[in-house]
Amino acid sequence: MASLRGVESVFGAGFRLWPGGQTPGELYSVPSSGLGPTRHTLNPMVTGTSVLGVKFDGGVILAADMLGSYGNMARFRSISRLMKVNECTVLGASGDYADYQYLKQVIEQMIINEELVGDGHSYSPKALHSWMTRVMYNRRSKMNPLWNTVIIGGVNNGESFLGYVDKLGVAYEAPTLATGFGAYLAQPLLREATEANPNLTKDMARNLIERCLKVLYYRDARSYNRYEIATVTEAGVEIEGLLSTETNWDIAHMVSGFE
């Protein structure tokens, strides 16, 4: 204490050796904020709901609505969640929109790097699907996942491809796929149609997708009646945007039991 008084006599009574810290005789509690893992990605801000995909004879169709939900609020109503990767591959993503934008930037740079080589090679749907499984599993293993579920569709060497990857890196291929709430509402309708007719035509597949989008708009609070449809055939990729489905709410007063 004598040495402390000597310091105070030189620097003044208000001088502290450790500003903001403990004083002699006091207990000091180490602040805990900032010492835990980063958790930004565990709280997605703007999210998109279902993405649907179905194979048809000669190609693949993917569809997604254009709503970005900020929590429970329908905040952004014209955002795209379908991406043309190249002339044979298209990607659709549900989940956190910021993570999707990051993925999109990475993939676009990969495509540019591949084109600079100039060897005529391009990423096939199956190659992109395999790469996505590694990316998602790697981020999940770092406890910092990309909060997305992705559907990749395309045509390569005359063969249609439709693959699924979630934020844990779980991946599989199927003739019909749906993410988000669509996995519960749209997938049964898609499977029923494809099991009854495995060789759907392009028009039949499109009508089926539009029917499922309408069901989702009626039943999914995070869905919207504006949507995009991507069609992939040997001729290339075509994305039609800002389409709108016609709805009829005349029977809404008859719906009960959900109050």
Question: What are these model-derived regions, one by one?
Answer:
Residues 1-259:
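Long, low-complexity N-terminal extensions
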